[in-house]
Amino acid sequence: MFWDRDADKGRCAAGGGHNAQGFMFVLPSNRPETAVGQTAWRYCRKCRGIYFNGFDTHGVCPGGGAHGRLRPNADGSRTDPNYLLNHDLPEGETATSQRTWFFCRKCFGLFYGGFPSQGVCAAGGGHDREGSFEFMLAHAPVASTGFGDDNVAIPVNE
């Protein structure tokens, strides 16, 4: 999952910039964590993807090294969104939501696991979802591109 509203498409683990396909997801931000909503998901300034920032380490970024948050303001404060991702919800998908999104325990990125291939991981090989929640993400009610719904764009601020 990556930010797609600028000319810069970030760095994809498969090489080059990200290629958007599918839905435009809308991620809630700066809300409290709940029993079915996990916070500490951040935007990476290097690869332009979403990664989990809840551990002491920050995974492996396709842009090199570990993922990195937006830089702090001059006064040291931070204004980058802290995304809340809903998980393990009992209801099924709707016309404006999609399940089968997972945390990769190797790169710490968020990836779509609804295809036989689990995608290319920046840490090598395919993504590994062992131990991950199954996330369900809300999206705008737009038609699919016909290429699958595995790459998306997100708003940095909601």
Question: What are these model-predicted stretches?
Answer:
Residues 1-158:
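Trp/Gly-enriched beta-strand/coil motifs that build multi-repeat beta-propeller-like domains
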